Design a protein with these regions (language model features):
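A short beta-strand element within beta-rich, extracytoplasmic domains
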Residues: 57-67
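Intrinsically disordered, low-complexity Pro/Gly/Ser/Thr-rich segments with frequent PxxP/GP/PP motifs
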Residues: 82-109
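Noncatalytic modules at the cell exterior or secretory-pathway interfaces
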Residues: 103-123
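C-terminal interaction-tip segments
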Residues: 1-20, 26, 116-133
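Short beta-strand/loop motifs in extracellular/secreted proteins, especially
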Residues: 60, 71-73, 120-124
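Surface-exposed ligand/attachment interfaces on beta-rich extracellular proteins
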Residues: 17-22, 37-56, 118
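Short, surface-exposed beta-strand/strand-loop-strand elements in extracellular ectodomains
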Residues: 65-87
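Solvent-exposed, conformationally flexible loop/turn segments
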Residues: 28-47, 87-90, 94-97
Length: 133
């Protein structure tokens, strides 16, 4: 049974325009994952988070947010051979074109490898909506 995921973006620029975008996407399944990523400053080590069991192209909406952001919070997609990226703010992607920024056929968005050297534990929340496996 399909589930409707609605979202709304409000963009307000001081002394400039305000833009509101709303949309919805139908997904077959969704997961909400919350993980505590321990600080590994003394010996940087990634925490592996299973995001979804599907192949490339199954994700329709993705939200990644944290209680702390910065250059010392980094992630990789799929495995440790992919590019390391900095989690310096929340990530919200919807649609194949946007999600292609993070995944490709050789590196599906099935896992996130998160390395935390911020000096304290960090809580990361991931919401993923996808088509059936």
């Amino acid at each position: 049974m399909a589930t409707n995921v609605s979202w709304k973006l409000n963009l307000a620029i001081q002394s400039g325009p305000s833009v509101t975008i709303t949309n919805a996407v139908q997904v077959d399944a969704f997961d909400r994952i919350e993980v505590t990523v321990p600080d590994t400053t003394n010996s940087p080590t990634a925490t592996t988070v299973d995001v979804q069991p599907s192949a490339v192209g199954k994700i329709k909406v993705l939200l990644i947010r944290s209680n702390k952001y910065g250059d010392q919070l980094k992630y990789r997609i799929h495995d440790n051979t992919t590019d390391e990226r900095v989690l310096n703010d929340a990530i919200f992607l919807t649609g194949a074109g946007s999600l292609d920024l993070l995944e490709d056929p050789t590196a599906p968005l099935d896992k996130l490898l998160i390395t935390n050297t911020t000096g304290q534990d960090v809580i990361v929340e991931i919401i993923v909506g996808r088509t059936a496996v």
